[in-house]
């Protein structure tokens, strides 16, 4: 990727094509790799395959295979299932390439924010060096990271120019996608909004009057959670941690586990 971007930097005259070329490069990498990791194969692609077979966005809400986190959002699996429908068959390679196209909006935001081809190339090399295979191996974590950074950039621009309707619309769209990638997206968005308000107390009233519109991405998240609640689809990790019968006792057991605290103390001692 470093050599590819270096070649682009010195050979491409039209700078607007650079984000698209990065997508093309990552697309080739995605096509050349098979989903073998658990989360990619047994959660995200499994959900997409069920949508492909059942012809329904709600296929996972029958709570079959509870270990596959059936409460997870369906936006990216839906796109993978749509790609499979486009070619007319399912395999473990082509559908996951749809995730790569999801990276284009953050890249365009990064490029417009940096306003310099060399800086964009430098940023892309650093970002993809850190994220590595998480971008194209079927995981959602790399994509979630890119959308978190791009949403942070848009919110920063919104803080500087809260009256710009284009930036506000883009912030809403970014936020809706952020909460629809993984469950963590909702908490990330909440942290970003709270941080925006805390770091701009002098503009608190002006920003707060505009931020009410950010209820839209929370509605996206809430609607999906209501569907999960209606079909009695729970998060197995949350259920195991908090429990249904006696959550206080389960939390006490976790904090009373001496071996965990002993392991932590050994780490600090070493």
Question: Where do the language-model regions lie?
Answer:
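Multi-pass, polyprenyl lipid-linked donor-dependent membrane glycosyltransferases
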Residues: 95-102, 118-155
């Amino acid at each position: 990727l470093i050599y590819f971007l270096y070649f682009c930097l010195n050979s491409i005259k039209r700078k607007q094509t650079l984000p698209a070329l990065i997508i093309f490069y990552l697309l080739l990498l995605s096509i050349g790799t098979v989903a073998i990791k658990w989360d990619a194969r047994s959660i995200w692609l499994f959900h997409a395959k069920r949508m492909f077979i059942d012809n329904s966005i709600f296929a996972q809400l029958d709570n079959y295979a509870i270990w596959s986190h059936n409460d997870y959002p369906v936006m990216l699996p839906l796109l993978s299932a749509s790609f499979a429908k486009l070619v007319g068959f399912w395999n473990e390679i082509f559908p996951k390439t749809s995730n790569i196209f999801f990276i284009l909006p953050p890249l365009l935001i990064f490029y417009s924010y940096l306003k310099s081809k060399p800086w964009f190339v430098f940023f892309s090399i650093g970002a993809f060096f850190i994220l590595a295979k998480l971008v194209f191996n079927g995981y959602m974590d790399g994509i979630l990271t890119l959308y978190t950074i791009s949403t942070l950039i848009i919110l920063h621009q919104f803080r500087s120019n809260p009256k710009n309707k284009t930036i506000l619309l883009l912030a809403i769209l970014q936020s809706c996608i952020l909460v629809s990638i993984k469950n963590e997206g909702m908490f990330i968005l909440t942290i970003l909004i709270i941080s925006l308000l805390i770091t701009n107390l002098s503009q608190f009233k002006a920003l707060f009057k505009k931020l009410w519109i950010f209820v839209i991405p929370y509605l996206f998240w809430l609607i999906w959670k209501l569907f999960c609640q209606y079909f009695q689809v729970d998060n197995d990790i949350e259920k195991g941690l908090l429990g249904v019968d006696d959550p206080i006792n389960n939390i006490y057991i976790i904090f009373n586990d001496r071996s965990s605290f002993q392991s932590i103390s050994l780490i600090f001692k070493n």
